[in-house]
C-alpha cells in the first residue's frame, strides 16, 4: 500500500462523520439555512485566499518545473475555478456571491485550520508536511461529492445538487497529484517523520469537519460577555 493511500484510508472514519453531520445532510436535502450558507461562503473565501498563499510558499521547495507548474495552475483554480461551486450556493439563497463575501469573517475553526497549514509551511523544509496539511481539503470534497451523487437522499430538484456534482469530479486531478507528490516526497522519510506527516493529514481532516460545522452553528469568537463581543 502506498503511503498516500494509507493516509486516505485512515481518514475515512472522519469523512464519514463529516458526511453525516448537519451541514452536509441539510445540503443534501436542499434545506441548508441561509445563515449557514453565508457563513460558509464568507469563511471559505478567506480560507481559499490563504490556501493560495501557501501554494506559493511551496514553489521554492519543489525540485521540478512540472511540480511548480502544477502549483501555479492550482493557484489559478483557487482564484477562479472554485468560484463556480460557491456561486451555486449563492444562487440557492438568491443572493449575489460578490455581495455575500463583501463581509469578511475569520471564525475560530478557520483560524486554527489556516495556522496549522502555515506552521508546516514555515517550520518544515520537506514540502510533504505542508502537503499533508493541505491534501485533505480536496480529498474530503471529492469523497463527499461522489458519495452524494450515489445517495438516494440527494435532492436532485435543488440547485444544491450541482454543488455535489461539481466536487464529484473537479477535485480528482488535484487528489491524484497530491498523492504522487506525497509518495515521492516521503520516499526517504523516517518512520517518525511519516508518523508526524500522517498526524498532519488526519488533523486537517478534523479541521475540515470543524470548518463545515463552524458554518452550521454560526461559530464566532467568544471573548466573555456581551461587552466584549
UniProtKB/Swiss-Prot annotation:
Keywords: Hydrolase, Thiamine biosynthesis. It catalyses: 4-amino-5-aminomethyl-2-methylpyrimidine + H2O = 4-amino-5-hydroxymethyl-2-methylpyrimidine + NH4(+); thiamine + H2O = 5-(2-hydroxyethyl)-4-methylthiazole + 4-amino-5-hydroxymethyl-2-methylpyrimidine + H(+). It comes from the Bacteria. SUPFAM superfamilies: Heme oxygenase-like. The keyword Ribonucleoprotein does not apply. Its EC number is 3.5.99.2. The record marks 47 as: Increases nucleophilicity of active site Cys. One of its GO terms (cellular component) is cytosol. It is an enzyme of class 3 (hydrolase). Catalyzes an amino-pyrimidine hydrolysis reaction at the C5' of the pyrimidine moiety of thiamine compounds, a reaction that is part of a thiamine salvage pathway. Thus, catalyzes the conversion of 4-amino-5-aminomethyl-2-methylpyrimidine to 4-amino-5-hydroxymethyl-2-methylpyrimidine (HMP). Is also able to catalyze the hydrolytic cleavage of thiamine; however, this thiaminase activity may not be physiologically relevant. Therefore, is probably involved in the regeneration of the thiamine pyrimidine from thiamine degraded products present in the environment, rather than in thiamine degradation. Belongs to the TenA family. This is Aminopyrimidine aminohydrolase. It comes from Staphylococcus epidermidis (strain ATCC 12228 / FDA PCI 1200). The lineage of its organism: Bacteria, Bacillati, Bacillota, Bacilli, Bacillales.
